[in-house]
């Protein structure tokens, strides 16, 4: 079996490592000339991604570049704030810290082995894919031709592989992907950046600033570097078809205008956003696509990572779920290979069975994650009365419940490589939070208390007028 991976993303490079472990032949085609450019992005590695990285022998390199999160601060426009120890609690439960680092650094770690092996081809932009019952052929803009048994699109939210898959399927079977065309929507934009250390912001802190129509998420990493995100609600929601033609676009000037407008807003411990902005090393503004596709494959083409699921960054699961995609697909391919032998190419029926099982696994896992990420972004921006109430009057008094909800997202349906030794690190949370739970009564109880609090506040306002 030979796999053609399109895209040197976190999903694509993780898949390369997984296939190497599974002894499956592959080549990875990346359109950029540089595998790990500095684009101002940071990445969070949660326990569910961390344990796969450990199985691949990469986690120790990641760990050298991170400052484990120990505490989380949350602030509100009225000056109220609270601190939670949930990051430390999650580490106790799962054996891995919540880790943030430069996305560039993670890509460098992931790319080192595959690049050295000669299996990564840079500057290879895919322009055409041809699918037959006997295999698949990929052509690049420079005229290179690659053949294999399976194409895996790991080329991001603007995926060329996804577009080619839709084109080929439509030509062969009509509009079988029509229901997928409107799956991605854009309701928010994000300015993300990395700043040099700021006095009064301590390594190991996460700071979330709730506001009306916007929010700020900051993580203080190793040596005090500040990884920050400014989320802004757009005037209207739009549908994104994946072609780059109909989505909103933003310039560096747009980003600067927003950051300067909010420079006076408090972050934490006397620090204002302007202090963070003044130390900014690199930044970028982008629309935030949200959505989960339900059809991931057609014949011998399959897509993974951001090309199939795009989440708001608030719960940190985007990259981790992409890592899981790579591991889950590798599990399915390796199991087939183990049963059939390394020299037998998969038939169309084989691939259909492999990929159908893979997609079923992933959709079961990712549905709740998509809902949680979408809800979190709107909660932080206090979008609507419900989110205003929940954010201000429920979360500060929820105790360990946010850690429990995060634990269910980490452990529920998480993946490891079946054909590699289990990760050495562990914790009770993997078993404790792995099964779906009954709907808790706690949120309903607190919601009732919130209603009482609002009534009291209204009465107080009336009496003091």
From Swiss-Prot:
Its cofactor is FAD. Residues 1-16 form the signal peptide. It is found in: Membrane. Pfam families: FAD_binding_3. GO terms for biological process: secondary metabolite biosynthetic process; terpenoid biosynthetic process. GO terms for molecular function: FAD binding; monooxygenase activity. The keyword Amino-acid biosynthesis does not apply. FAD binds at residues 30, 44, 103, 306, 319. Pathway: Secondary metabolite biosynthesis; terpenoid biosynthesis. Gene3D superfamilies: FAD/NAD(P)-binding domain. Its main location: membrane. It comes from the Eukaryota. Keywords: FAD, Flavoprotein, Membrane, Monooxygenase, Oxidoreductase, Signal, Transmembrane, Transmembrane helix. It is a single-pass membrane protein. The chain crosses the membrane at residues 440-456. Its EC number is 1.-.-.-. GO terms for cellular component: membrane. The active site is at 210. It catalyses: 4-hydroxy-3-[(2E,6E)-farnesyl]-6-(pyridin-3-yl)-2H-pyran-2-one + NADPH + O2 + H(+) = 2-oxo-3-[(8S)-epoxy-(2E,6E)-farnesyl]-6-(pyridin-3-yl)-2H-pyran-4-olate + NADP(+) + H2O. Pyripyropene A and its derivatives have very unique characteristics of selectively inhibiting the acyl-coenzyme A:cholesterol acyltransferase 2 (ACAT2) isozyme. Therefore, pyripyropenes are expected to be developed as a new type of anti-atherosclerotic agent. Furthermore, pyripyropenes have been shown to exhibit anti-angiogenic activity against human umbilical vein endothelial cells. Finally, pyripyropene A also exhibits insecticidal properties. FAD-dependent monooxygenase; part of the gene cluster that mediates the biosynthesis of pyripyropene A, a specific human acyl-coenzyme A:cholesterol acyltransferase 2 inhibitor. The first step of the pathway is the synthesis of nicotinyl-CoA from nicotinic acid by the nicotinic acid-CoA ligase pyr1. Nicotinyl-CoA is then a substrate of polyketide synthase pyr2 to produce 4-hydroxy-6-(3-pyridinyl)-2H-pyran-2-one (HPPO) which is further prenylated by the polyprenyl transferase pyr6 to yield farnesyl-HPPO. Belongs to the paxM FAD-dependent monooxygenase family. This is FAD-dependent monooxygenase pyr5. It comes from Aspergillus fumigatus (strain ATCC MYA-4609 / CBS 101355 / FGSC A1100 / Af293). The gene is pyr5.
């Amino acid at each position: 079996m030979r796999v053609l991976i399109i895209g040197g993303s976190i999903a694509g490079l993780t898949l390369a490592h997984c296939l190497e472990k599974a002894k499956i032949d592959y080549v990875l085609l990346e359109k950029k000339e540089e595998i790990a450019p500095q684009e101002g992005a940071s990445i969070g590695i949660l326990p569910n991604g961390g344990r796969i990285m450990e199985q691949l022998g990469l986690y120790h390199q990641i760990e050298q570049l991170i400052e484990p999160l120990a505490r989380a601060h949350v602030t509100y426009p009225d000056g109220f704030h609270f601190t939670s120890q949930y990051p430390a609690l999650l580490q106790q439960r799962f054996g891995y810290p919540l880790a943030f680092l430069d996305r560039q650094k993670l890509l460098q770690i992931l790319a080192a082995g595959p690049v050295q092996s000669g299996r990564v081809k840079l500057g290879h932009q895919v322009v055409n894919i041809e699918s037959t019952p006997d295999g698949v052929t990929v052509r690049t803009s420079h005229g290179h031709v690659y053949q294999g048994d399976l194409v895996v699109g790991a080329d991001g939210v603007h995926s060329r592989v996804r577009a080619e898959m839709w084109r080929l399927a439509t030509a062969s079977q009509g509009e079988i992907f029509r229901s997928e065309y409107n799956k991605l929507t854009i309701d928010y934009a994000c300015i993300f950046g990395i700043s040099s250390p700021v006095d009064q912001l301590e390594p190991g802190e996460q700071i979330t600033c709730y506001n009306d129509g916007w929010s700020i998420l900051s993580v203080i990493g190793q040596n005090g570097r500040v990884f920050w995100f400014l989320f802004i609600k757009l005037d209207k929601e739009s549908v994104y078809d994946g072609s780059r033609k109909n989505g909103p676009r933003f310039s560096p000037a747009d980003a600067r205008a927003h950051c300067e407008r909010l420079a006076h807003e408090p972050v934490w411990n006397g620090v204002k956003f302007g202090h963070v902005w003044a130390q900014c090393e690199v930044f970028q503004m982008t629309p935030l696509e949200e959505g989960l596709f339900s059809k991931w494959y057609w014949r011998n083409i399959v897509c993974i990572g951001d090309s199939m699921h795009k989440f708001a960054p608030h719960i940190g699961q985007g990259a981790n779920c992409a890592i899981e995609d790579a591991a889950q697909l590798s599990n399915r391919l390796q199991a087939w290979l183990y049963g059939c032998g390394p020299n037998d190419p998969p038939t169309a029926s084989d691939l259909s069975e492999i990929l159908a099982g893979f997609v079923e696994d992933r959709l079961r896992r990712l549905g709740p994650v998509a809902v949680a990420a979408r809800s979190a972004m709107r909660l932080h921006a206090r979008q609507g009365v419900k989110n205003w109430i929940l954010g201000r009057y429920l979360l500060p008094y929820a105790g360990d419940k946010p850690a429990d909800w995060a634990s269910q997202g980490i452990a529920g349906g998480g993946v490891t490589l079946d054909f590699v030794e289990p990760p050495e690190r562990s914790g009770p949370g993997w078993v404790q939070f792995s099964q779906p739970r009954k709907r808790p009564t706690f949120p309903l109880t607190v919601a009732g208390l919130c209603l009482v609090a609002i009534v009291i506040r209204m009465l107080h306002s009336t009496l003091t007028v």
